[in-house]
A protein has these predicted regions:
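Secondary-structure transition/capping motifs at alpha-helix termini
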Residues: 32, 68-76, 97-107, 127, ...
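Active-site-adjacent bridging/hinge elements
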Residues: 34-42, 65, 100-101, 126-131, ...
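Short hydrophobic alpha-helical segments that form membrane-spanning helices or hydrophobic packing faces
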Residues: 170-171, 223-225, 351-352, 405, ...
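Short secondary-structure boundary/capping segments
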Residues: 59, 93-98, 183-184, 229-230, ...
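Non-catalytic interaction-recognition regions
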Residues: 142-149, 561, 607-611
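Feature 926 captures the class I aminoacyl-tRNA synthetase adenylation module centered on the KMSKS loop
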Residues: 198, 390-461, 465, 510-553, ...
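Structured ligand/cofactor/substrate-binding pocket environments in proteins
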Residues: 54-68, 74-75, 83-84, 150-151, ...
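N-terminal, positively charged nucleic-acid-binding surface of large information/translation enzymes
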Residues: 1-231, 255, 272-285, 289-304, ...
């Protein structure tokens, strides 16, 4: 082998290459100043374990493939990787690990515990992703860094002073376990088996009994109205009357409202403050009084059931109703219960003072802006629009937790108990719960006591400006003004469209009056082999390194691309990884063959067969590049696998081996050079095309051949000289396959001579010499022979 290429590919070279890439600065962001810049707004993953699972890692591999492609296209790519270290995930994890409750531990001690837990995971987390060959620029300053938090606070200060953020006391979804407010997207729904309880109310004016069905009898003391559908003839007579609510006997109005479903229960519905967002809407619409009976810890705080938690109160009230003969019947049913997205505790709606970002009044403008973003695939735009349309409440962004960005807010408490909020100007990172107030805050509080706000931001308030951070907004290479918003791409899963994507859009509009980024690339969820989501509780999480150690990173990346259709879920499939390993071997062996020849210095006169494979390459490459430009890696790997293995290796290489070696001197020197030149041309260009997906084997070979990295090469558009008709090549493939099948049927070795004359169509005659010497037949002629050997009637022999 002229270029000293070893006989076999060795997986151990992958880790050596990672070190080489790091030493050569492949992972470091470089801004040249004279090349286009493109930003990948990499999703900062929650750091809740020392490794991501393989499904999550596959999506990051997709982003890496896009970054590598763009670099080879002459683009300065900002592809950062940092961790989302804020918020409930790490707090809940620390609480569980040490069997503590955050609110019962000194704040500074709890923050230190959270940081130490995060630090213990981060190094291995990053290194495990790097083992897949991910070429991100690792930024150790995650969302909990002073740098990031100062940026978050700066945007809050801007929005506060411009009137887009306000504080108000209002009903808010609340997690009793986490003791914090939640936004709409932070609520999940889980199926729960319960009872529909049929309970007797009395009509105050007539004394008659009416029956109301509810799954939440614990909210009877919080009931403020009873409604029925305006068209329900059974209850029209009750309009304007009042109901006496058991067990505490409060009197509430009976009113018509279209929210009542005549087919559910008895058709009469109790409205409580608050059972769900429907109750909240109706209470606001009808201006009903508010009776809050559940406190921040999820316990009853008024009446005879004071001190009981929600479940205990439900059981006690049911028992009391039964004793009083007011529970008519119970029907078992399964319904969806809103729960906290992190700890899965059922959510209550209570009245608290929170900070809100305006969003409901902006819905029409946000829908208009959603149309400006380029979605890949486009159907996911509608999911975003549908979510915007569904919004009914402004976004509560304050949280009563610890490990998150502090709200830069102080209160001037007057002697009469009134409180005035003071928000300083930006410029540094503020921690009002422990820091002394800045001078401007002191100067603004006359005749009052200054108190620092102890609350923190919803973690989405931080994450929703990741596109600013990724653009170097706080870095030395701040290119925000050059790239915003036209040269930023957000890659993310469809599962966080209503959170990360939506909040990013809202924040961009409020801060800049525009979209946050031009491109939105949506990927599906990584599933196990049975098509189920991977969860520790299910025991089906697949370690991201196990298949890498067994088959190599290129093989696993092959699966990630081959399974990763844009917008669709993708299953783990070890068989596809095995195919990837075989493909690595094929790429290696192709390279060994091509590199066994000296590369021609100049382009010779090509044969028709050579021009045909180049035309097929042109056609394939054009589709591959178009797909890459659409941030798609699924189509490129399938196209390139088919072309490299089945077109180039199986057919073209086999067809021109005799001509390239020319051991018998039957071909002219120019014909021989044409074969070798074409072998090199197709090999080099196809390797550049597949290098973003399979970076290890391609780079190793390239370094043997040329002494440099393939990832620093330029990937130009396919040469216009290659454009042409490749039907000759398709025809030759059919002829080759027909002869090989014939030899198999006859038990003849594929390398053995075949003492026949081969007859082919006239259009195949330009390949006659290559066909003759490849298949070792006596001659190749135009026409029909005695014995047809293929189903189409193209190939016959005599």
């Amino acid at each position: 082998v002229l270029k000293n290429l070893p006989t076999r590919w060795d997986i151990k070279w992958e880790e050596e290459l990672i070190k080489t890439w790091e030493e050569e600065g492949l992972f470091t962001t470089k801004i040249s100043g004279n090349r286009p810049i493109f930003v990948i707004d990499t999703p900062p993953p929650y750091l809740s374990s020392n490794r991501p699972h393989i499904g999550q890692t596959a999506s990051y591999a997709h982003f890496d493939m896009i970054a590598r492609f763009l670099r080879m296209r002459g683009v300065d790519v900002i592809f950062p990787f940092y961790l989302d270290r804020n918020g409930l995930p790490i707090e809940v994890q620390v609480e569980k690990k040490y069997n503590i409750v955050a609110h019962e531990v000194p704040r500074d001690k709890f923050l230190k515990m959270c940081k130490e837990e995060l630090d213990s995971y981060e190094k291995e987390f990053v290194q495990s992703l790097r083992r897949w060959g991910l070429s991100f620029d690792y930024w150790p300053d995650g969302t909990d860094s002073e740098e990031y938090r100062q940026m978050t606070q700066k945007t809050f200060i801007d929005l506060w002073h411009r009137g887009f953020i306000y504080e108000a006391e209002r009903p808010t979804p609340w997690c009793p376990r986490c003791k914090t407010a939640l936004a709409e997207p932070e609520m999940e729904y889980k199926e729960e088996e319960t009872y529909l309880n049929y309970i007797v109310f009395k009509v105050k004016e007539t004394g008659e009994d009416i029956i109301i069905a509810t799954t939440r009898p614990e909210l009877l003391p919080a009931t403020v109205a009873v409604i029925f559908h305006p068209d329900d003839e059974r209850y029209k007579k009750l309009n304007g009357l009042h109901a006496v609510v058991p067990p505490e006997g409060q009197v509430v109005p009976i009113l018509p409202h279209r929210a009542a479903n005549p087919k559910y229960g008895t058709g009469l519905v109790m409205i409580s403050t608050f059972g769900d967002t429907r109750d909240l809407m109706i209470v606001n619409e009808l201006k009903l009084p508010v009776r809050i009976i559940i406190d921040e810890g999820g316990r009853i705080k008024t009446g005879r059931y004071t001190g009981l938690n929600v479940r205990e109160a439900r059981e006690r009230i049911i028992a009391d109703l039964k004793k009083d003969g007011l529970l008519i019947k119970q029907e078992r049913l399964v319904h969806n219960v809103p729960v906290c997205w992190r700890c899965k505790t059922p959510i209550e709606i209570i009245v608290t003072r929170e900070l809100f970002v305006k969003q409901v009044e902006l819905k029409e403008k946000l829908i208009e802006l959603a149309a400006k973003m380029d979605f890949k695939p486009p159907e996911y735009r509608q999911m975003l629009i549908d979510w915007i349309k569904s919004l009914e409440l402004d976004w509560p962004v304050s949280r009563r937790r610890y490990y998150a960005t502090e709200i830069p807010l102080w209160w001037c408490v007057k002697r009469d108990g009134s409180k005035m909020p003071i928000v300083p100007k930006g410029g540094r990172y503020y921690r009002p719960w422990i820091d002394q107030p800045p001078e401007e805050v002191k100067n603004a509080c006359v005749d009052g006591e200054i108190q620092g706000d102890a609350r923190v931001f919803d973690t989405w308030f931080d994450s929703s400006i990741s596109w600013m951070y990724a653009s170097g907004f706080t870095k030395r290479f701040n290119v925000f003004d050059k790239v915003y918003p036209h040269s930023i791409m957000r890659p993310q899963g469809y599962d966080i469209i209503r959170t990360w994507l939506y909040y990013s859009l809202l924040r961009a509009y409020l801060l800049h009056g525009d979209i946050p980024f031009k491109y939105v690339r949506i990927n599906g969820m990584g599933l196990d082999e049975r098509g189920e989501a991977m969860h520790k509780s299910k025991g089906n999480v697949i370690d991201l390194l196990a298949p890498v150690e067994k088959y190599g990173a290129d093989a696993v990346r092959f699966w990630a691309a081959a399974a990763g259709r844009l917008g669709s879920d993708y299953r783990y499939n070890e068989n596809v990884i095995k195919e990837g390993k075989e493909f690595v071997t094929k790429l290696w062996n192709i390279s060994r063959f091509v590199l066994s020849f000296e590369e021609p210095a100049a382009k010779p006169l090509l044969t028709a067969v050579d021009r045909a494979i180049l035309a097929k390459l042109y056609h394939t490459a054009s589709r591959v590049i178009k797909a890459y430009e659409d941030f798609d890696v699924y189509e490129p790997i399938h196209l390139l696998y088919e072309f490299i293995w089945h077109d180039f290796a199986d057919h073209y290489i086999e067809l021109v081996k005799s001509r390239a070696y020319n051991r018998d001197g039957v071909f002219s020197k120019e014909e021989q050079n044409a074969a070798v030149w074409t072998l090199y041309t197709v090999w080099k260009y196809s390797f550049k095309l597949i290098a973003p997906i399979m970076p290890f084997v391609t780079d190793k070979v390239w370094r043997y051949a040329y002494g440099r990295s393939i990832h620093n090469e330029s990937l130009e558009d396919p040469s216009e000289d290659w454009r042409g008709d490749y039907e000759l090549f398709n025809l030759v493939k059919k002829i080759n396959s027909a002869i090989w099948r014939y030899k198999n049927r006859k038990g003849i070795s594929l390398a053995a001579p075949l003492d026949v004359v081969l007859y082919v169509p006239e259009t195949a005659m330009p390949a006659a010499m290559d066909l003759k010497h490849t298949h070792k037949v006596r001659d190749v002629r135009q026409g029909k022979g005695v014995e047809q050997i293929d189903e189409e009637g193209l190939v016959s022999i005599s």
